[in-house]
Amino acid sequence: MSLDLVHFPNYKKTFFGSSFQSDTLALLTRIRDEIGCRYVTHTYRGRVGDCTKVNSADLTVLITLPATWVARYSSKNYFAIDPVFQEDAPYYRNDTSAIARDLKEDADICPAVAELLHDAEKHGLGNLFIAVSARNPKGVAGCTVFTFEVEDEDRTQFLARMRPRLLSLAGIIHGTVCGCKDANSVASLLTPREVDCLRWAANGKTDGEIAEILSIARWTVVTYLQNAKIKLNCSNRTSAVATALSLGIIDMPEVQHLV
């Protein structure tokens, strides 16, 4: 097993490869600014730039956390209890997809995880940690953790409101880090109408609303999205939208429709 660690402390440049660094750091900064998260961590089982090995023993971790917290995390050996890195974590399983989970669920059943999250909050990382699954067209799985400071809104309502957006963004980050960007071959499989339906779905529109916008029947929209899902090798609509976004087949939607 090998570990590739890519660290942008507080969204600052590092000594990592300049091409990867510029594109990825710009993406992470844009995501932070758009959704108001504090920090982003992404991990997937594979090497940087390798999007082909399913269930690899290798691990890539991309973080924007402060260097002081990374040092503390290491000294406390939090890796051993972090729910995102456990062997049975649901985010990497082949039979699951489109997961957006408040890590408080893990803290409620494990005192060690509760201690980890409390320590992270005490050190300014936020009070809400949401783990989001991602999967590329080749089946390589990953997980993004977004941290937020939520005061006035119920956690459950916040997660429900942000879930579609976070799933899309996790897919974009995943595709960027593991280098699965061969959009031309995938895009050529999709019809213009399938792309249109994916684009409107990414903007939060229902099947009925998409049908009205495109002046077609609702069942036709369902068929287009089903075909797109199959062509993108995705198990559900949300995953198909996230994959299309990560490959640049459709543009990242504005966040206003979720507010």
Swiss-Prot record:
CDD domains: LuxR_C_like (cd06170). InterPro entries: Sig_transdc_resp-reg_C-effctor (IPR016032), TF_LuxR_autoind-bd_dom (IPR005143), TF_LuxR_autoind-bd_dom_sf (IPR036693), Tscrpt_reg_LuxR_C (IPR000792), WH-like_DNA-bd_sf (IPR036388). Gene3D superfamilies: Transcription factor LuxR-like, autoinducer-binding domain (3.30.450.80), Winged helix-like DNA-binding domain superfamily/Winged helix DNA-binding domain (1.10.10.10). The lineage of its organism: Bacteria, Pseudomonadati, Pseudomonadota, Alphaproteobacteria, Hyphomicrobiales. Transcriptional regulator involved in the global control of Brucella gene expression. Mediates the effects of the quorum sensing autoinducer C12-HSL (N-dodecanoyl-homoserine lactone) on a large and diverse number of genes. Keywords: DNA-binding, Quorum sensing, Transcription, Transcription regulation. This is HTH-type quorum sensing-dependent transcriptional regulator VjbR. It holds the Pfam family GerE. One of its GO terms (molecular function) is DNA binding. Residues 207-226 bind DNA. Residues 76-179 are annotated as: C12-HSL binding. Residues 183-248 form the HTH luxR-type domain. GO terms for biological process: quorum sensing; regulation of DNA-templated transcription.
